[in-house]
Amino acid sequence: MQWNKIKLTFILAFLILNVYLVFQLFPQEETEQTVLETESQDAVLGSVKGYKELSDQKTETNQQYEATKLHFTEDDLDKVPNNDNMDLDISSNTQLVVKFKEPQKLPVEFPIADDNDQAIGDLNNFVTDHVLFGAEYTYWGRQGNQLLFFQKMNQGQTYFSPDSLLLVTINEDYEVVEYEQTYIKNFKKLEENEDQDLKEYSEVQAVKALQSQQLIESNDTIKVEKGFYPTIELSSKPNYAPAYMITVNNEKHYFYLLLPDYPYVYAPTESGFLSSLQPETEETQ
């Protein structure tokens, strides 16, 4: 009888020991896995050109912004530079459509590389000379026969917003035949968001998030810029989230959006953006 008690005691002791070892083993494996992943990420980013120059200071927050759409008036039409060669239409109220009576030759030759600062500057100057508030728009790129320019606010550049867009149409001779313009003003912090506990983010944090999704690989070249990306409108006013734009190898653009709940990585395309601007047909409604 005594021997049975001793055996039972040993069995229980071994069971308790096994349970203890299991609980000790799993955290250790998770820790080792985390260390390996961190070491792997550090090795990749260590070879990425432009990474060492980034700041790890958390200087940006997820404070959301809002703006007001400009409603164009007849007085605005009188302020359009060189408007004697234009037919102007503001029938849609928040969009100005301009058609040139005589096509305007651009001061550049296509294609234009993203790092051709001289050509991009010449395009921006052309817009300044022919567009209302033209100095506030910055050239983004070309998609087919259309050139995209996005409005830049005092707080930073906006990206892929239908409400702060200049869309220039060119013909087969690379001459400007028309453009469509939207414009925002009163760009400010969203009041409903000001009382919330804001989270802080850094350039390094944004880049690491991309690398963890294998969007940045060894020996890539990156460039990080700050700006604002449109979000779902919670009212009649356009809403924007702060964003880090990460350009990889001067080809692919990713946006690390600082949304209210959690960050989100998004990679828009020019073609997709332009398609979203097209009005719905009766078949798709």
Feature map (PLM): residue ranges:
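Hydrophobic residues embedded in beta-strands of well-ordered beta-sheets
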Residues: L96, N145-L147, Y174-V177, P263
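Exposed beta-strand-loop-beta-strand "reactive/processing" segments of non-cytosolic proteins
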Residues: T128-E172, E225-L258
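Preferential activation on post-signal-peptide N-terminal prodomains/segments
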Residues: M1-T138, Q143-L147, M153-Q157
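Short helix-loop boundary/capping segments
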Residues: T169-V207
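Extracytoplasmic/luminal low-complexity segments enriched in Pro/Gly and acidic/polar residues
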Residues: E194-Q285
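Noncatalytic linker/hinge segments flanking ATPase motor cores
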Residues: K52-T61, K189-E191, Y264-T269
